[in-house]
Amino acid sequence: MAKEKFERNKPHVNIGTIGHVDHGKTSLTAAITKVLAKTGGATFLAYDLIDKAPEERERGITISTSHVEYQTSNRHYAHVDCPGHADYVKNMITGAAQMDGAILVVSAADGPMPQTREHILLARQVGVPYIVVFLNKVDMLDDPELRELVEMEVRDLLKKYEFPGDDIPIIPGSALKALEGDTSDIGEPAILKLMEAVDSYIPTPQRATDKPFLMPVEDVFSISGRGTVATGRVERGIIKVGEEVEVVGLRPTQKTVVTGVEMFRKLLDQGMAGDNIGALVRGLKREDMERGQVLAKPGSITPHTKFKAQIYVLSKEEGGRHTPFFKGYRPQFYFRTTDVTGSVKLPENVEMVMPGDNIAIEVELITPVAMEKELRFAVREGGRTVGAGVVAEIIE
């Protein structure tokens, strides 16, 4: 196999297949690898290779995910596909597989089904920004009017969850036919058409280094003769010596200047996304800062206590709770580097939440945390993880 083809000289995009069980997500994933393999952009992976997804553990949660990579003439893609519905829920909520866009697979024979809806809702809640639709199994429909009806249903459903339903590309085809080598419109050409839509409709994501600087504070030291140093791994952006930053979260926001950046005991002129650094800050004492705060570009992030979230509650088998929880539940919420206690408000018609459930909740923290939409967190009880969540909306 020509290995040297996979050079990282193309923009990289993370995508995944979502949609109802048995609508053809895994067959489509296999078909993409088969069709792109013809131009050397992929290694063909048969259905059963993708379907036997290895289990991974992300924050103590067991998730089965298949990772496939391939490239078009414009881009390099990492593609995730999950065997079971529960795996999708966990994957999207934990952010284990961050998606820049998704391919929603809908069977033309069945139309949108309950998990179609749930995956679109999850995509909205966890911040999957773009969706392209593959209308699968169109060979099972004789009536073109029926296909148009299904297409309209899908567009309406997307609009209901605030996706631009009218503008989203919907590509009709048959993943199975493409796998069989069919060269009619619904076979291999449909897969190529789908990839063109993915290439053009899903924008290249902003690189981590281009985003505003943020570093979660892991520890704070006082170094005699030098001052106060905050250590942590830069989550995004770049910090240059002499730049102003804000210390956000847990206490009133303070401004300071980074007067030095160290890495492996060497002085640098900047730290960037992915670096573990020590940042020397001007005019702050060791007791002015603590783990759980963040250093950030001024104005880029603010502290909040009330937010809406989508959470997945670990099952007993995953080491989660053995019993349900009710309204007024007060666990700790672990954001980045620290736990903050908060109280949970359940949706109106929900009395209790069972282990293994996935639900939208409202949280009020006792101290403010630097947060924004799409921030991931763990739900913990005395240091034990009992759930995973993502901020869907900030209230105050």
Curated annotation (Swiss-Prot):
Pfam families: GTP_EFTU (PF00009), GTP_EFTU_D2 (PF03144), GTP_EFTU_D3 (PF03143). Disulfide bonds: none annotated. Residues 136-139 are annotated as: G4. Belongs to the TRAFAC class translation factor GTPase superfamily. Classic translation factor GTPase family. EF-Tu/EF-1A subfamily. Mg(2+) binds at T26. Residues 19-26 are annotated as: G1. Residues 174-176 are annotated as: G5. Keywords: Cytoplasm, Elongation factor, GTP-binding, Hydrolase, Magnesium, Metal-binding, Nucleotide-binding, Protein biosynthesis. The keyword Glycosyltransferase does not apply. Monomer. GTP binds at residues 19-26, 81-85, 136-139. Residues 10-206 form the tr-type G domain. It is an enzyme of class 3 (hydrolase). The keyword RNA-binding does not apply. One of its GO terms (cellular component) is cytosol. Its EC number is 3.6.5.3. Residues 60-64 are annotated as: G2. It catalyses: GTP + H2O = GDP + phosphate + H(+). GTP hydrolase that promotes the GTP-dependent binding of aminoacyl-tRNA to the A-site of ribosomes during protein biosynthesis. This is Elongation factor Tu 1. One of its GO terms (molecular function) is translation elongation factor activity.
